[in-house]
Amino acid sequence: MNRYQTMFKSLNQNKLGAFVPFITIGDPDPTTFIHIIDTLIQSGADALELGIPFSDPVSDGPSIQKSMERSFKSGANISSCLQLIKKIRNKYPTLPIGLLIYANLIFKNGIKNFYAHCSTLSIDSILIPDLPIEESSLFYNSAMYYQIAHIFICPTNASLDLIKKITDKGIGYIYLLSRSGITGINNTEFNKIKLNTLIYNIKQCNQKLPILQGFGIYSSEQARSSLLSGTSGIISGSCIANIIEENHPNIDLLLEKIRKFTHLMKIAMKL
């Protein structure tokens, strides 16, 4: 049983959903980043989704773009990011750790070489936001070879045919988009009818594959609504990026706000 399976099984038995924070690796600097990770985990985060900064993050809104800029300014590159993941893995051996990375960064390092390196770090999943399923075979095959879950994204306009393809190949979980566009906080209401239909169709195709909803989830009310709609939990990143932006370099205040945000999300994850 892998780490995701163990996590979801334990949460299901306790009637809980998963709170998975997203954070750009090295934001705002390597030392503070590790303090933030420790605070998230100690406050109850069930898994981590960690992003490697990229110069043209087409799927990410202003908050995550700024977090990537801060990471770059602190000297982040792929090598330093993977070293930070190694630290986290050594400290938290049973925690599911997912990686979000844009396709070009993997190409530059060589697909097989990159997945081989990730395997040595015990990375559990890799999500590539700019990679359509039709072009994913080389990445997917390397992921399968090294026993890393290739996470597929289910967009809001997914056809039943696309959902079948995703659920047939999906491992770990499915990333369900709350809405189209880019990540970030805005006042656009989620189309609950459309989301409920997507969740129903996913479960009709594969009842065993967990669904995590992301994109624009910034409140405990949204998180709660997602769970009650039938997902297995949520991924939230822009709120954390905003907390870092608004409170750094006041580390104590920054960590306290991270702690409070995580606590609220964990309360929302109780069925």
Swiss-Prot record:
Q: What class of enzyme is it?
A: lyase
- Pathway stated in the Swiss-Prot or TrEMBL entry: Amino-acid biosynthesis; L-tryptophan biosynthesis; L-tryptophan from chorismate: step 5/5
Q: Which GO terms describe its molecular function?
A: tryptophan synthase activity
- Enzyme Commission identifier(s): 4.2.1.20
Q: Which residues form the active site?
A: 49, 60
CDD domains with a match to the protein in the record: Tryptophan_synthase_alpha
Can you name a GO cellular component term?
A: cytosol
Q: Which Pfam families does the UniProt entry name for this protein?
A: Trp_syntA
Q: What is this protein called?
A: Tryptophan synthase alpha chain
Organism encoding this protein: Blochmanniella floridana
